Amino acid sequence: MKKKGKNRIIIGCKTQLKDINTLFASIFTLTSLDFSHFDTSQVFNMKSLFFDMSTITDLDLSNFKTDNVTDMSLMFKDCSSLINLNLSNFNTNKVIYMKSMFDGCCSLINLNIDNFNTENVISMRSMFSFCSSLKNLNILHFKTNKVNDMRYMFYECSNIENLDLSNFNTENVKNMKCMFSKCLKLINLNIKNFCFNNINNYKDLSVILDISKNQKDSNIGNMFENINENCQIIFGN
């Protein structure tokens, strides 16, 4: 690990690490890291890698090789000052856990994850919770066939205006509690292909909307409470 400047560190490693769980967690003095010499080709665990790095503003991870990674849960959780995040070369083909991956990234305005393959992911719980500066999020390409937990997935994404989840397969999802709660500016939500057959807990699936006129079933009556009253939700036929 080499120092460069007051708040910038160049990361280098002569050995091939396999588990870098919490490697940089809770470091409060850095604003950026240089990973151009960091070999991640053998890594399988990146859980909580940057957890609670509350002063980091820029992360360019375009050099990361993630072909073998299975766990990315809490990877950027509570990186509350993070503004620029480059994940353009991430290979997520083997990733199983994305729980709270971006949870608490409240300064992140743009998030490009168009390259993410989520076909093996089983948990997306709180994946984007408290991403309160995000205005747009393109995840239409997400494959969610294996996902069983989506609770709090977009909780308090308070600036997001449009969410197109029309390609989501939710047949195996068991919990959607508070999935859209406190999405205060959400205008359009497309969930036309959502399946609720295995849901154990509907309460507060919330998009901050009273749909009592359209939904009388007491089991899902609180599904969309407390969001933008003008939000248009597209359901299936």
Functional labels for PLM-detected ranges:
Residues 1-237:
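Negatively charged
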